[in-house]
A protein has these predicted regions:
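Short, low-complexity, intrinsically disordered N-terminal peptides in bacterial proteins
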Residues: 1-2, 10
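Flexible coil/turn and secondary-structure edge motifs
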Residues: 2, 18-196
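Hydrophobic h-region of N-terminal signal peptides that target proteins for export
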Residues: 7-19
Length: 196
């Protein structure tokens, strides 16, 4: 069963030669296209799936989530090898790739479907997420308080195929969107050298 799942994900058993199994992390950082790009660049991350979480309907579509009526937020599910990258490192990537001072928007995207969040899968992830919020709150790189919630993970629904790897499949459109949205200039303003 595990071997079949790994093959479905496009992961060879050899990639887990260290004897550990993959772990899962779930984050919402606004537009899932941008979050997917940020996490896919991290060594030790095996896959990143764009999708929806923290909502009240089954198998939501992009159109339904975009309406704001399903309660879902755009998120990414990150599969990673904990022998190669720590959950703490993924938390660092998360923090510097979103604006933690808003509860219902990220950059030019407004609405509850763009709310940020850390969705923990076990008590250790919760503990580490709480500690990371304290750590980033003490940095005082900006004036507003951190309002990003840390919530128990719920059902994650993969988004439609055309959303997966959007930044790779549509690089020009993605660049126009992410630049026009002011995402990177705002992140640099918030986090400065921490983003490098």
């Amino acid at each position: 069963m595990i071997r079949k799942l790994l093959l479905i994900l496009g992961i060879s058993v050899a990639s887990l030669a260290n004897g550990q199994s993959l772990a899962t992390a779930t984050f919402a950082a606004g537009c899932f296209w941008c979050a997917e790009e940020a996490f896919e660049k991290v060594p030790g991350v095996v896959s990143v799936i764009s999708g929806y979480t923290d909502g009240k309907t089954q198998k939501p579509s992009y159109e339904e989530v975009s309406s704001g009526r399903t309660g879902h937020t755009e998120a990414v599910e990150v599969k990673f090898d904990p022998g190669k990258v720590s959950y703490e490192k993924l938390l660092d990537v998360f923090w510097v790739n979103h604006d933690p001072s808003y509860t219902d928007r990220q950059f030019c995207d407004h609405g509850s479907q763009y709310r940020p969040g850390i969705y923990w899968h076990d008590e250790e992830q919760k503990r580490l997420a709480d500690a990371s919020r304290v750590k980033y709150g003490k940095l005082k790189t900006f004036k507003q308080p951190i309002v990003t919630p840390i919530v128990k993970a719920s059902q994650f629904w993969p988004a439609e195929d055309y959303h997966q790897d959007y930044y790779k499949k549509n690089p020009v459109r993605y660049k126009v969107y992410s630049t026009g949205c002011g995402r990177y200039s705002r992140l640099d303003e918030l986090w400065g050298k921490l983003r490098k």
